[in-house]
Amino acid sequence: MKEIEVKLRISDVVQTRRRLLEAGFEPEGERVFEENWLYDFPTQTLRQSRSLLRLRKSGDRAIITFKDPPEGNLRYKMRDEIQTEVAEAEVMRDIFRKLGLNETFRYQKYRTAFRIRDESRGHVLLDETPIGPFLELEGATDWIDQAASQLGFSPGDYILKSYVTLFRESCPEQEFEGSAMLFGSTYSQPNPKG
C-alpha cells in the first residue's frame, strides 16, 4: 500500500480538536495510547537504506509495519508500506530479538483519528507526543492539500520528517541519548531554542 502523508505542528490540542469538528471531521474512535518500537540489524541496513521496521502497540492491537525508503517527492512523504496485525506485541519483540534485530528507538504518543463522514480518500491523525502535538494528514495528495487548507494550513507548513528526526532535533546535543521518546523522560523534552 502506498502511504502519502505530511505532518503539521500544532500548539493547542483542544483548539485543534475544535477546529477539526467545525471543519466536518468526526473522531473514528477513542484517543488511544501507542507504544512504538523501531528495529534494525546490527549493521543498520534498514536505516542506511532509509527503510523502517516498526512494531506498534495501539490499545489492544499490535501491528508490524515495514516501510520502503521514501520517494523523492519534496512536498509529501510517500512510501510503500506493508503491515499486518499480530496477536501479542511482547512475543513479537522476542521474535525480533531472536532474529538478531536490535531495538533502535522507542516512542510513545496518544493518537486520535478523524475522518470526514462518507469520505474514504484520507484521514487526520491528532498525535500528542512528548515533543508536542502534531497533525498527520494521510491520503491522496489533493485531499491532503484540501484538508490542510480547511484547517488553516498551507504547503509551507508541511513537515516530512519522522518523529525520530523531530525528537533528535528537539534535544540538546549533549543530552541526546537517542533511544527513546517517552512521556516523563528526561530526553523527551523539546529544546526551548528549537
Predicted regions mapped to residue ranges:
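Short loop/beta submotifs within extracellular cysteine-rich repeat domains
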Residues: P27-E28, I144-Q146
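A generic beta-sheet turn/junction motif
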Residues: K57-G59, P130, T141
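Surface loops and adjacent helix of pleckstrin homology
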Residues: K67-P69, T129, A140
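N-terminal strand-loop-strand beta-hairpin
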Residues: M1-R121, D157-G194
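A contiguous pocket-lining binding segment that forms or flanks enzyme active sites
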Residues: V124-I131
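Long, well-ordered alpha-helical scaffolding segments within enzyme catalytic domains
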Residues: D145-I159
